[in-house]
Structures are given as C-alpha cells and as structure tokens.
Amino acid sequence: MHKLFTYLCSALLLVTATSCEKKTEKLLLGGSGWNKIVIIDKNTKQVEWEHPLEKGWECNSAVATPDGNILFAYARGAKLIDRNHQEIWNIAAPDTCEMQTARVLPDGNYLLGWVGHPAVIMEVSPKGEILSRTEYETGIEHPHAQFRQQNKNARGNYLMPLFATSDVREISPRGEVVKITRLEGTPFTTLALANGNHWVACGDGHSLMEVNLDNGEVARRYGENDIKGARLFFVAGLLPAKDGGLYVCNWQGHDKNAVEANSPQVFEINDKGEVIWNLNDNERFGMISTISTIE
C-alpha cells in the first residue's frame, strides 16, 4: 500500500509540474531588405523555421493564419504558404504596383493591399477568393511613398497610413474618404486599443504614439530616445503583447550607422513603456518590419 501511495504521489507531482510549464511563445518575423521570414522561439531566440525570399521581394507584412499557414506580401504579390513551404495560392500585383499589406481580419478572411494608381484594397477568403475590392487614389505620385500596412477598423472602414502626407486616412469600402488624421513622420501601421484609441508607428518620425484617430488627440508619445534601452529608428510593425504590452519593430534600414547604436531590431514594452524583452542580433537577423505570433 505504501508503494502504491508513493507511486500515485509521484505521478500527481509529474502531472502538476507538466501542467504548470509555460507554453513557449513563437514569433513570426520578416522585414524589408531581409531575404527570409522566420519563426523564432521567444525565450531562446533561436530560429525554428525559415522561408527564403527572392531578391526584390520586399516583405513588410507577414502573419500567421488561424490554421497555422503563413500569409505574406512580397511587393510583387501576396502568397499563402504552408509550413512545408508549399504555395496554397498567390495573388499578383500589377507590374507598376507593390503589394504591401497582408493581414488577417477578425472574421477569418484576409486583407490585402497594393500601392499604385489607384491603390487597391481587397478582402480575400482563406481559399484565395477575392470577396471585395476597393480602389482609392491617394494623390501621391510615387507608389512606394504611399502605404505599408493597412488595417480594418470596427466601423468596417480601412485605415490607410500614408508616408508622403504623414497622415492616416479612413477609407470606406466604396473608396470614399471618411476621415484624415494628420500625424508625423511616415506612418507605417495602426493598432486598435480597447479604449478606442490606436497605436500608430510613425516610421522615419522615430516615434510611436497613441492617438484618438477621430479627433487627432495624442494620449501618449514615445520619441527617439524616450524608451530606455531602445533608441527608435524607423518604427514599423506593431503587435499586442500579453498583459497590455506591445511589440515594436525597430527597422534600421534608413540609417547606415544604426548597428553602432546597439538598439534592438524588435522589442517588447509593458504598459509603462519599459523594455521587458528584445531581439538585438544583427549577425543572425536582418532588418525587421513585421511581427506576428504563431502557434
């Protein structure tokens, strides 16, 4: 009986210990100027999967889909691939345009967007079926100076951050301007918050700000040297982290001396703006402008 009791206690302890182990978070990373997209273990910072990109495939949007596939924009189009690198579908952009946006929407469909004349926003099913298409003329002559990551807001409109005009435009599905919010720098992406505000990554403005896009009021702003341990360069992709924190992609391609600053390529801040995790390894990782969690 004593042996049986000891065995049962040991088994219970093993189950308890196993159940208490934290599941390791995985991050999908990519970036303009980097020749691959990768999945890393957040804790070890080791690359566990990588997919090569051809020369000229500028990737500013890469995201994991709910079923574990990888959706990414690569300037010439957008692809959905599986973890075995098999292409599920590919939607090409016209020769004079650049596909820059590839996002997963809350309803499970995807948001794609290319810059050009006009710029085009599409909602696409997981099977690659184009469900809707919105055209909008930005008025910005050079397509590359238009947008990178667009998002869809709770009103069902599209948020288009524009480089050349330093603003975020809310565009209806019919291609009509609903609202223009003037900001600073070269806005790269937006991220909705529970309070109705949005984080806006301001690119070459070397800044990150929380903004009410309805009235333009800035609730918080971090400038180039405001975050201890992370000098801001081109502030790019954003991702919500646990406990109200935020992942920030700190793309360094516009400053030839960026490596000397020893500032992380991507980092996580808590709700107080303190760095609690970072990735700073220019030998193993390229310039990072997009981030996603992945199972």
Language-model features, listed with the residues they occupy:
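Histidine-/acidic-rich catalytic cores in large beta-rich domains
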Residues: 23-295
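Bacterial N-terminal signal peptides that target proteins for export
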Residues: 1-8
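Bacterial Sec-dependent signal peptides at the C-terminal "C-region" and cleavage site
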Residues: 8, 12-24
